[in-house]
Amino acid sequence: MVDAAKAGQSNVGVLVGGGPAPGINGVISAITLEARNRARRVIGISDGFQWLMRGDTSHVRELEHDDVSRIHFHGGSILNTSRANPTKKSEDLKRVVESLDQLGISYLATIGGDDTMFAASQVAKHASGQIRVCHVPKTIDNDLPLPGEIPTFGFETARQLGSELVQNLMEDSRTTGRWYFVVVMGRSAGHLALGIGKATGATLSLIPEEFPGAVKISTVCDILEGAILKRKALWDRSHGVAVIAEGLLEQVSPDELSDIEGVRITHDAYGHLRLAEVDLAYILKTLVEHRFASRDLPLAVVHKNIGYELRSAPPIAFDCEYVRTLGYGAIEWLLSTDATADNAGCLVAVINGKLEYLNFASLQNSDTGKTRVRRVEIDTPSYKIAREYMIRLEKEDFADEEKLRILAQAASSPKQLCSPDEFRARFQYLTTDLKGAS
């Protein structure tokens, strides 16, 4: 509990919004230690905006050196987190600003992803310069619009742990002669799925950026089926691992999802589809296995989801170092000059080894006002090289008549024959020019 008698001071507040990510505690630690070094009191706010937007200032505590000195090694968040959204109602935003004022908080550090950043920008706007807000970008999705290839903190730890899990699944796949369909967390972008797939050399990776618009589940199944047939036909291997970004679901028609037995569509406080509640891995496993069973072709698929086990992992050294710099940078900006209505909020980033501060407005979509999403750029050498090492049906497979004959033969069974022309008609539409760096 914060001493109300001291609430008039210019305190530093810190809160966490959105899902967990490795490194959160390191940010809290760096912010607290640097603020205390500058003789500022630090108020830790529990559960994001959840209580502040109700006008409840009791879920806070003062943070001292001993509270944070070793927490940077640990996953999770000592302040917890929540997806409470104060931007839906102006009354909620007003209560947030009033609550911060009651706590004597003139400087607020928010830790979170795109939604929390948008909420932070609105708090800064509604405070009219009375509260300065600095946002520290956090998400294992890596989808905040930071310049260039700069990752959000937590991403590299999530990729490392995810890669270790997929590496184990690849060995299990080889040992047991099975396929694994691994769906990886990533609401709007395929950075994590592609990062894991490329690092491990998974058989193939599927990300939403491959599809310019809506995508059908049947198309995803066609890609997977084609990859399985090609691997069997050309290398005589009945095993493999497909890494699939859960964000594909965002581009599937809700009507198509609703038609799938057992699927229930719900949304979170920010209006996003609750992707983890739609088991894409199981849906794909069931549909692809059915395709092979209908032709009496043997296929064993295991479905696996990777996401929650990555979010609260202990951060690797990269993220431990990274978040210390970000936390310091947040305090450096917050306490550097007096806030004004025009200069009251920013995002802290490390660009070319230097601390930079990006205005909230520069990170927002001009049409919606919401935070822009950074997606995988599929026309880059990085993505095209990743495609080079995947096993998928490509244009050259249909240009080579002998290879096409072998592929068609792999898709055939005594129960259902497949001619080269039928194979071409069935799968050629999947081919692209995305393979190989240019």
Annotated model-derived regions:
Residues 11-14, 71-83, 138-150, 175-177, ...:
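Gly-rich Lys/Arg/Thr-decorated short loops/hinges at beta-loop-alpha junctions or inter-strand turns
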Residues 17-19, 40, 45-50, 83-84, ...:
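Short, ordered loop/turn segments at secondary-structure junctions
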Residues 99, 107-112, 118-122, 126-134, ...:
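Accessory alpha-helical/coil subdomains and C-terminal extensions
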Residues 1-5, 52-108, 116, 140, ...:
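Glycine-rich oxoanion-binding loops at beta->alpha junctions
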Residues 2-56:
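N-terminal phosphate-binding or glycine-rich loops at protein starts, especially the Walker A/P-loop
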Residues 257-438:
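C-terminal non-catalytic interaction/assembly regions of soluble proteins
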